[in-house]
A protein has these predicted regions:
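GHKL (Bergerat-fold) ATPase N-terminal catalytic module, capturing the glycine-rich phosphate-binding loop
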Residues: 1-191, 199, 599-601, 605-612, ...
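GHKL/Bergerat-fold ATPase module in large chromosome/replication-associated machines
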Residues: 119, 137-160, 166, 181-700
């Protein structure tokens, strides 16, 4: 039963809509099938994500139902695409369907014209491609949200629409019902045919992550002399199986080929066309996908192997034809090597090794030529190919490094690019330590490590930017082995004077008592903070620098970074260890040390006298027993030493308690610690809230 009917005008001039779509998005009408199915897949992807939290909260949910079902009523010219995705409420239909143009359709098209062909349609915009073939389009949908009603939207290819909320029964999900414009002979011939729709689905949707069902599978019925439907759904989706030989093509054809193989991906950064007949016949196209800001992942099925256009495998694991690091690429390799489906045969073939060596050589030669001939293009694409280069360094450090060192690059925090030789020349004069080691400083996050980066720059040092997801941190270990007398240090792993130790001992130093009172006072406040472990050190950072900085050792960070690529790693389960370095040149820290000494002097004097006396006793005992082996000492002698050591330990604990009690309510210590933790991105939650309140109090 209809509860509410709304009519209105779509937020776009329909006369302007089709020319814009044709100009920017759809070179031919058949692309609408991809857009509609992609929207359905997108809706089910969201449903799966929602259900992963608590699928019992979703009515009649079953992951087995996550399928796109496509049907065609040839008699009436009605094409329906149904999904079991998240569906839409009336408000969502209003937002995503009726209000396509937020500030004008032209602006919307302009914003997305470069990405609109990436496979997953922009719901609303991709949906409107259906009007290229349909004279009327309906949406019947029900949201997964509790209490949602069925929504029915209708538009006849004009700015007017009708939107209804009903109590009609409808499963969660969406039906897109396209009434084909059969008055157009081209549309009638191209789209009102089950065979042609099936071909289009195979062309555009065969690699979708959910089943795409089009009718039923058929079998031959000899008694009827024809094929008849079975009860089994005809799922047109398959593994990444393609059967298209490479040929000399234009850039646009390369891109189109790539999108046919991998619908939904961004355009590739570059591609390499393999073409050889000696020493072995080899054809293929390898694409470098855009990988910046994405998690590292080896696509084992990214490269498909063919032999004379016959599919062999898309699982390259264990096959020496393609090194592991090449499996970051996408594409097709076609060779006439005598192949057998046996995995061991592939692994042991001498011809396979020759093919592999040729592929690596051609890829490296191509990258080197791009750097030489069009450096800007290479630099623009570097962030997309760096994972490939870095993984090559890690997995094949000897052979691959010798080729890749000619074109591999560093990027600094200012966004400038350098070859290895260029960068060494840049820093060689200024970034050597007292032992003549060249120190490469690097950061992994410019925003969170700004303080450390600027401190290094103030010293005239250059800082590289490494992307942890791009395997930079793992690759640098290989580079350290290859670069003569060189080391890489993360810019926030220590104070700059220790990162590049020039052997200069000049600077403000604290005496033993100052260091002790500060160390014990700060450690008493840091103990157990934020689930981290801390130690306190001292260094002259300059009187204009922060009073304190927090760092994590290079070794600790590397172990942690390495563990990201290892399952169940010990280092992933270990707590982080940080160093808090107090600036001895800071007037604030110096005054704080004086205040703490003054505040604790009276209570500490008798305790320190007691410690000195007990240390004297231990020294006398050790002197008395120095010539007696431990196993030859009497139980009485052992107990005498043990009691003396326990006594001095208890006295030291009393001393620590004095420091702890005195520092407990010291707002200056709290503020200094929190400023350091905040700059390191550690201060969060309740601790951050307390810091902000304390800061306001200081201002008052």
């Amino acid at each position: 039963m209809t509860e509410n009917i709304k009519t209105g005008t779509i937020g776009v001039n329909i006369g302007d809509l089709f020319p814009l779509i044709k100009k920017f998005l759809y070179s031919n009408h058949e692309i609408f099938i991809r857009e509609v199915v992609s929207n359905a897949v997108d809706a089910m992807t969201k449903m799966k994500a929602v259900a992963s939290g608590d699928d019992s909260a979703i009515e009649d949910y079953s992951e087995d139902d996550l399928k796109v079902r496509v049907s065609l009523d040839e008699e009436n010219g009605i094409l329906t695409v149904s999904d079991r995705g998240i569906g839409m409420t009336a408000d969502e239909v209003e937002k995503y369907i009726n209000q396509v143009a937020f500030s004008g359709m032209s602006d919307f098209i302009e914003k997305y014209k470069d990405t609109a062909n990436t496979g997953i349609g922009h719901f609303g915009l991709g949906f409107y491609s259906t009007f290229m073939v349909g004279k009327t389009v309906e949406i019947v949908t029900r949201s997964y949200k509790e209490g949602s009603k069925t929504v029915h939207w209708t538009c006849a290819g004009t700015p007017e629409f009708q939107l209804e909320e009903t109590n009609d029964e409808h499963q969660i999900g969406t039906d897109i019902i396209i009434h084909l414009n059969l008055e157009d002979e081209e549309i009638k011939n191209d789209f009102n045919s089950k065979d042609k729709i099936r071909d289009l689905l195979k062309k555009y949707c065969r690699f979708m992550p959910f089943p795409v069902i089009f009718g039923k599978k058929q079998k031959w019925d000899s008694s009827l002399g024809k094929n008849i439907d079975t009860d089994e759904d005809d799922d047109i989706t398959i593994e990444a199986l393609w059967n298209r030989r490479p040929a000399d093509v234009t850039d646009d054809e390369y891109k189109k080929f790539y999108h046919e193989l991998y619908p939904g991906n961004e355009e590739p950064m570059l591609w390499i066309h393999l073409y050889a007949s000696d020493p072995i016949d080899l054809r293929g196209i390898l694409f470098f996908p855009k990988t910046r800001d994405k998690n590292f992942f080896i696509h084992r099925d990214g490269i498909s192997l063919y032999s004379k256009n016959v599919f062999v495998t898309d699982d390259m694991k264990g096959i020496e034809l393609v090194p592991d690091y090449m499996q970051l690429l996408f594409g097709v390799i076609d060779t006439d090597v005598e192949l057998n489906v046996s995995r061991s045969y592939l692994q042991n073939s001498g011809q396979i090794k020759k093919v592999s060596q040729y592929i690596v050589k051609k890829v490296c030669d191509k990258l080197k030529s791009i750097l030489t001939e069009d450096r800007k293009k290479f630099e623009d694409g570097w962030d997309d190919i760096r994972s490939f280069i870095n993984y090559g360094f890690i997995s094949d450090s000897e052979k691959f490094y010798e080729r890749a060192k000619e074109f591999a690059m560093f990027k600094d925090t200012d966004g400038k690019y350098f070859t290895f030789d260029e960068y060494r020349t840049l820093i060689e004069a200024n970034q050597k330590d007292k032992d003549d080691n060249l120190v490469y400083l690097y950061a992994t996050d410019v925003d969170s490590q700004t303080t450390y980066i600027e401190t290094a720059k103030d010293k005239g040092y250059s800082v590289l930017i490494f992307n942890e997801q791009a395997l930079d941190v793992l690759a640098l270990q290989t580079l350290e082995q290859k670069f003569e007398k060189s080391t890489f240090k993360r810019v926030d792993s220590d104070v700059i004077s220790r990162l590049i130790d020039k052997g200069d001992d000049a600077g403000v130093k604290f005496n033993e008592r100052q260091e002790e009172v500060l160390r014990e006072s700060f450690m008493s406040r840091l103990e157990g903070q934020h689930g981290k472990f801390f130690n306190v050190t001292f260094a002259d950072l300059g009187k204009d620098s922060l009073p304190v900085i927090v760092s994590q050792s290079e070794w600790g960070r590397r172990m942690k970074d390495n563990s990201k690529f290892q399952s169940n790693s010990l280092f992933m389960r270990m707590g982080d260890i940080y160093t808090l370095t107090l600036n001895t040149a800071s007037p604030l820290v110096s005054h704080l040390a004086s205040d703490l000494l003054s505040e604790t002097e009276e209570k500490l004097k008798p305790i320190q006298d007691d410690i000195d006396e007990k240390d004297k006793v231990i020294k006398e005992i050790n002197e008395k027993l120095k010539d007696i082996k431990f196993e030859d000492q009497t139980e009485e002698q052992k107990k005498e030493r043990q009691d003396a050591e326990e006594a001095v330990q208890k006295a030291r604990q009393k001393k620590q308690e004095v420091y702890k009690d005195n520092a407990a309510d010291n707002k200056i210590i709290s503020q200094i610690i929190d400023v350091a933790l905040l700059s390191a991105g550690i201060l969060k939650g309740d601790a951050l809230n307390k810091f902000l309140k304390r800061t306001v109090e200081f201002i008052k």
